[in-house]
A protein has these predicted regions:
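N-proximal low-complexity "stem/linker" segments adjacent to membrane-targeting elements
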Residues: 1-24
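Cell-envelope/extracellular polymer assembly enzymes that use nucleotide-activated donors
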Residues: 4-6, 36, 157
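Short, acidic, metal-binding catalytic loop of nucleotide-sugar glycosyltransferases
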Residues: 20-34
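Short beta-strand/loop segment that forms part of the nucleotide-sugar
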Residues: 33-44, 61-63
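Active-site nucleotide-sugar/metal-binding loop of Leloir-type enzymes
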Residues: 73-83
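Short beta-strand-to-loop acidic/aromatic patch adjacent to the donor-nucleotide binding site
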Residues: 81-92
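Conserved donor NDP-sugar-binding/catalytic core segment of glycosyltransferases
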Residues: 91-130, 167, 171
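C-terminal catalytic/acceptor-binding lobe
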Residues: 156-317
Length: 317
């Protein structure tokens, strides 16, 4: 029997879009009999309680509103598949036999340690908006989707673990350029902003949590390396508390330089990418919303000059 896929699908306030996504799963799958969908809907979202898919079994969880990490964790705990695929209700699968392509990756790694991700037609190879893991990897990580992540950064969290694993001598990241799962997000001009997007805000949260879990991710990478070598795995530390990030611009940039560019446990291109992303988010949060300030307008004008060194560094992988 083929390895079974479990799709984790938290959704809120978008029954039509969720069912559009489910139709794309049914239409594009080579082996729908070996796919299950774990659907999480909030108690106070009755319009979504009846979301279903005739072609593929749907395991429905109706519960309280949770963090994004909590939603994915709840779905993962109910899943039974060999391959775990966290997806969003604002995505559409575009590639026929997409599940076969994922199973082919799964079969390449007898020890089950890998992170695969498709092309979302936006981020490309830069980071995994859909981080696909084996159940074996999830079990080694213990908490693959930490509940402390309220909104974003779970994708960065997992990618960072595997970048650290790469420095430890094991490159287990697989980018599936020809497998397209399109992200239909307003940010990319592919959808209208709805109540669910407005609830999360123009910039997701999680910067502080991501930075605070740096040491945790290093231990997680060491656990995966130990699993590959069939050696005893180190224990994971407590998640701890998210640090308070500097508000002062100079202190913030200095902090990100120290945290990311000076971190020899991750590849140089990934250090540059994280520094650029977190620094940009600092200035966007502070100066773009709710109304663009002069500092934002100045930085926007200087952006091409500021970005090119990091884009250059990121080419060296």
């Amino acid at each position: 029997m083929h390895p079974a896929l479990s799709i984790l699908l938290p959704t809120r306030g978008r029954p039509d879009r969720a069912e559009q996504f489910l139709r794309s799963v049914a239409e594009m799958s080579a082996d729908p009999a070996n796919i299950e969908i774990i659907l999480y809907v909030d108690k106070d979202d009755p319009a979504s309680h009846a979301i279903d898919c005739e072609a593929i079994p749907v395991i429905r969880i109706i519960g309280p509103s949770l963090t994004m990490g909590g939603l994915n964790t709840a779905c993962y705990r109910r899943s039974t598949g060999d391959i775990i695929v966290p997806l969003n209700d604002d995505m559409i699968i575009r590639t026929p036999d997409w599940d076969r392509k994922i199973r082919d990756v799964h079969d390449r790694f007898p020890d089950g340690i890998y992170l695969a991700y498709p092309n979302d037609l936006h981020a490309g190879e830069t980071f995994p908006s859909t981080p696909i893991l084996s159940r074996t990897t999830c079990q080694r990580l213990i908490s693959p989707y930490p509940e402390v992540y309220a909104g974003g950064f779970i994708d960065y969290h997992l990618m960072d673990i595997f970048k650290r694993l790469q420095v430890l001598g094991e490159n287990r990241v697989v980018y599936l350029k020809d497998l397209v799962i399109e992200h239909m997000h307003p940010q990319y001009g592919k959808a209208e902003t709805d109540a669910t997007y407005r609830r999360r805000g123009p910039l997701d949260v999680g910067d502080d949590v991501f930075i605070g879990l740096r040491g945790y991710r290093q231990k997680a990478a060491q656990r995966l390396a130990s699993a590959i070598k069939d050696q005893p795995s180190p224990d994971l530390p407590d998640l701890g508390k998210a640090p308070l990030l500097p508000d002062n611009d100079f202190l913030a940039v200095g902090h990100f330089l120290n945290v990311f560019l000076a971190d020899g446990a991750i590849p140089l291109h990934w250090r540059a990418h994280l520094f650029e992303v977190l620094t940009r988010r600092h200035f966007l949060k502070k100066y773009k919303y709710p109304e663009p300030a002069w500092q934002y307008k100045l930085l926007k004008a200087l952006a091409p000059l500021l970005k090119w060194p990091f884009q250059f560094i990121q080419k060296f992988k």
